[in-house]
Amino acid sequence: GPWNISDEKVPDLSTYIDFGAIRIPYLQGIELRVKKQRESNQVLGITVTYRSSSVEVEAFAAPKTEGIWSEVRADLLKGNSDAREVNGVFGKEIILPVKVEDKTVDTRIVGVDGPRWMLRGVFSGVAAGDSKKASDEAVLLNKWFSDIVVDRGSEPLAPRDMIPMHDVSVPRDSDNGGSGDSGEIPGRPKGPLGADQQVEVKTTLTRGPMFSEVR
């Protein structure tokens, strides 16, 4: 994993949280934040926090013939003099230092190519460290990321376009889903090379894992 929706051994989705383009596994104790575009109310991505670590997840369109992670990785290295490439559990990964208030911290950017899609994860906190010398939090979030299922859909999208997502559908005891509301943030990301920004948690809902509005 991560998995394509049509893979023969795709995980059982009955306990997954459904965002349309991506289905994420439920993990006890996570906080889940949903980002939306202000004007269209379109879901842009999600961030999962577990203890002192987080991972931001977004899915992007790719050509039929080849993946895009190698060129995205090259662009990241070219555009950020402090970035470095490392070998990690997801293959070639990028360690990118970012400034947070008055200090600099590392983020770990991973990309996985699938059929006409690329899934990007940006790990921060303890899980941003070398994934081959992983902490317990990194091991858990690496496994969580690898269990994500991507549903690219058939709509035409240009390479690096974000694959549209929908509002969350939360599994209950059966296959019947619930739903959680989420907030908005101004502006639409430019794609996998855009700058990651800290978002402010506004509201926490109570169903399932912790869902939060971000603006």
Question: Language-model features: where?
Answer:
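N-terminal membrane-targeting/anchoring modules of bacterial envelope and secretion proteins
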Residues: G1-D12
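Secretory pathway targeting signatures of secreted, lumenal, and periplasmic proteins
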Residues: Y16-G67, G191-P192, D196, L205, ...
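Surface-exposed amphipathic alpha-helical segments
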Residues: I30, F123-S169
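Canonical SH2 domain fold
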Residues: R33-V34, G45-V48, V57-A59, I95-P97, ...
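Short amphipathic alpha-helical segments
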Residues: K64-V72, D136-L140
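Signature of long, low-cysteine stretches enriched in small and polar/charged residues
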Residues: V72-R116
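Acidic-leaning, charged glycine-interspersed low-complexity segments
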Residues: D82-E101, R152-S174
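Short, highly charged C-terminal tails/helix-capping segments
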Residues: L157-E200
